[in-house]
From Swiss-Prot:
PANTHER family: PROTEIN RALF-LIKE 15-RELATED, PROTEIN RALF-LIKE 16-RELATED. Its main location: secreted. GO terms for cellular component: extracellular region. This is Protein RALF-like 36. It comes from Arabidopsis thaliana (Mouse-ear cress).
Amino acid sequence: MGISKKTVVQSFALIIIISIVMSTTEANSIGAPAMREDLPKGCAPGSSAGCKMQPANPYKPGCEASQRCRGG
């Protein structure tokens, strides 16, 4: 039992339709500004000497045992 002529024609038609749709789509590429390193707002990429990023969660040391802040 072989593949019917109808199935072969439908397969070729589907391949042609898919290739037409894929060739006519417009794809926008991601430019270099989207992939550069993060800079704070208002800082130019060339003059970032005065634009230092602040840490999101600065280090805060834990408390002493004498302060009894951890149930101790």
